[in-house]
Design a protein with these regions (language model features):
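Amphipathic alpha-helical segments used for helix-helix packing
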Residues: 122-128
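Hydrophobic alpha-helical core bundles mediating ligand binding, dimerization, or RNAP-core interactions
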Residues: 2-6, 112, 130, 141-148
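Crotonase-fold acyl-CoA enzyme core
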Residues: 7-121, 137, 154, 159-162, ...
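Conserved donor sugar-nucleotide recognition element shared by glycan-biosynthetic enzymes
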Residues: 1-2, 157
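A short structural micro-motif
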Residues: 132-133, 167-171
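Helix-loop "lid/cap" segments that line or gate small-molecule binding pockets
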Residues: 77-78, 129-134, 147-152
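A general structural signal for short secondary-structure boundary/capping elements
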Residues: 65-66, 126, 146-147, 172-174
Length: 175
């Protein structure tokens, strides 16, 4: 049932950022990949070592890793059980930022503060439509069109438009 938990993280309508300090291996790496963004401390290490136990990742690692870093490199890492250091994870697109360990939580808060002033309904729809791209049972483009249209009916859209036209900061209510 772990995959249901990880899918819930991935589909959470509120932003979820993984703050990785140290090792994120196996399920820990899979949990980080389920988050919307990842911030790594300089000492972070990432890997999927399940093949050493005769297993494959069971909580979405075989799906999310190629989505994040590309098929060829993902297959290499899954088959060899090699680990990535924080800088390589950043270079490959697995993490959004690499910071000194003592700045890890501050960087996460900084990102969340930037997001917190945006329209909550639109943030939730971004999560939904981006994830639809990777869901083979859904048409990501159709989902985007439907959710885009739905945003026009929200109070947040009206507030955002009014704030823009009146050159003031929007005060979103999440409705």
């Amino acid at each position: 049932h772990g995959h249901h938990v990880f899918n819930s993280v991935e589909n959470c309508p509120k932003p979820v950022i993984a703050a990785v300090n140290g090792f994120a291996l196996g399920g820990g790496c899979e949990l980080a990949m389920a988050c919307h963004m990842r911030v790594a401390a300089e000492n972070a290490r990432f890997g999927q070592p399940e093949v050493k136990l005769g297993l494959i990742p069971g909580y979405g690692g075989t799906q999310r890793l190629p989505q994040l870093i590309g098929k060829s490199k993902a297959i290499e890492l899954l088959m060899t059980a090699d680990m990535l250091d924080a800088q390589e994870a950043y270079r490959l697109g697995l993490v959004n930022y690499v910071v000194p360990a003592d700045q890890l939580m501050d960087k996460c808060r900084e990102i969340l503060q930037k997001i917190a002033v945006q329209a909550p309904v639109a943030i939730a729809e971004i999560v939904r439509t981006v994830n639809a791209h990777y869901d083979k049972t859904r048409d990501g483009f159709r989902e985007e069109v439907e959710r885009f249209g739905a945003c026009f009916t929200t109070e947040d859209f009206k507030e955002g438009t009014d704030a823009f036209l009146n050159k003031r900061k929007a005060e979103f209510k999440g409705r």
